[in-house]
Amino acid sequence: MKIYLVGGAVRDALLGQPAGDRDWVVVGADQARMEAQGFKPVGKDFPVFLHPRSGEEYALARTERKSGRGYRGFVVDADPLVTLEEDLLRRDFTINAIARDEDTGEFFDPYNGARDLQARVLRHVGPAFVEDPVRVLRAARFMARLAPLGFTIAPETAALMREMAASGELDSLVPERVWQELRRALTCAQPSAFLRTLHDTDGLRAILPEIDALYGVPQRAQFHPEVDTGIHQEMVSDMAARIAPGDALVGFAALTHDLGKALTPPEQWPRHIMHEQRGVAPLQALCERLKVPQDYRQLAVIACREHLNVHRLPELRDRTVHELLVRCDAFRRPERIAQLALVCEADKRGRLGSEEAAYPQGAELKRLHAAASAINARDLAADGLQGPQIGEALTKARIAAITAARKTSA
């Protein structure tokens, strides 16, 4: 019985990056032997155990044979005779197929993952790559993390990803897994690499058609020197990752704020009048399909519908600013204002030549919200107002607070 550290922990250590969870593989053991040593079985689809002291996951070395469509269509063999090399062969990328002996610290790298780490190449291990459509998503997500380090996808790996897209294999991806990989990509330093990887290998159309439809749609160069809406979307996603690092909530709202531009009739290009309203329907469809959590949906819809209003904040009347805050449910969910401000800043700075531009609207929105929020309904009730009178007086007082706050900054 031999134990090896495998996967991301080994990869990240060799890259000099902070490692997350550690995964272990056990060669030469079966379930009875693992349980006899105090390991607790937890795996449903294949034999995984929790260490009795550390709680870390230990999996028996195994092989996988394709038996059906999709990422669940596999027959697993975890016989004690399965070798370390056979276990590493089933893994997705060479940089994830490196093992380190727990006792000696010796590395085992039968598929030249260390060489690819040094060359900054994401390469599949073997032809079985095409059997699991999740690997297309993982390739894109790894690029969102590794592209800032100079990684590229091996041409032969990109070719296999195109074959998988053409075969329809990506249609078998379950929504929860698509959302999981998308959400993780949005926490990475360069989410645009997730989009670009899928787009360049023909997978984005099957996985995120609402985003794919933005590529090739022109915008007015006066406001968008990058012109292509798809390129703008990539820039916005990267800017969101820069100003709100690790915040997938802000990242998702930034990613989806301009979906309505794909629905603009071509004869109206490059203008996109009312795109902020048209974008709500495809956004809601995307959220339904991927089973996106409610907090993500709600912020994304607000950002889609209101981002132009925030950009035009200095032009809005005081009453209109209050109406904007009400539509955002900002008096019950005050955190949304800071989140919306970040999304709108990412939109404004996610344009060619505007990357370092100031965005005073964000701070002003938060300041006006704070002024309006200082008005308390309980104080009005204490003055003897009742029922609808309180609501009317509260609105009037909050608008007055916005007016006063604007005068102090004038």
From Swiss-Prot:
GO BP term, pick one: RNA repair
Highest taxon of source: Bacteria
Entry's Gene Ontology molecular function annotations: ATP binding; CCA tRNA nucleotidyltransferase activity; cyclic-nucleotide phosphodiesterase activity; magnesium ion binding; phosphatase activity; tRNA binding
Record-listed CTP binding positions: G8, R11, R91, R138, R141
Keywords annotated in UniProt: ATP-binding, Hydrolase, Magnesium, Metal-binding, Multifunctional enzyme, Nickel, Nucleotide-binding, Nucleotidyltransferase, RNA repair, RNA-binding, Transferase, tRNA processing
InterPro entries (alphabetical): CCA_bact, HD_domain, NT_sf, PolA_pol_head_dom, PolyA_RNA-bd, tRNA_CCA-adding_enzyme
Amino-acid positions noted as binding Mg(2+) in the UniProt annotation, renumbered to this chain: D21, D23
UniProt keyword Transmembrane helix present: no
Enzyme Commission (EC) number: 2.7.7.72, 3.1.3.-, 3.1.4.-
CDD domains in the cross-refs: NT_ClassII-CCAase
Residues annotated for ATP binding in this entry: G8, R11, R91, R138, R141
Family: Belongs to the tRNA nucleotidyltransferase/poly(A) polymerase family. Bacterial CCA-adding enzyme type 1 subfamily.
Quaternary structure and interacting proteins, as annotated: Monomer. Can also form homodimers and oligomers.
UniProt comment concerning the protein's domains: Comprises two domains: an N-terminal domain containing the nucleotidyltransferase activity and a C-terminal HD domain associated with both phosphodiesterase and phosphatase activities.
Entry-linked PANTHER family: MULTIFUNCTIONAL CCA PROTEIN
Protein name per its UniProtKB record: Multifunctional CCA protein
Native species: Xanthomonas oryzae pv. oryzae (strain MAFF 311018)
Gene name for this UniProt entry: cca
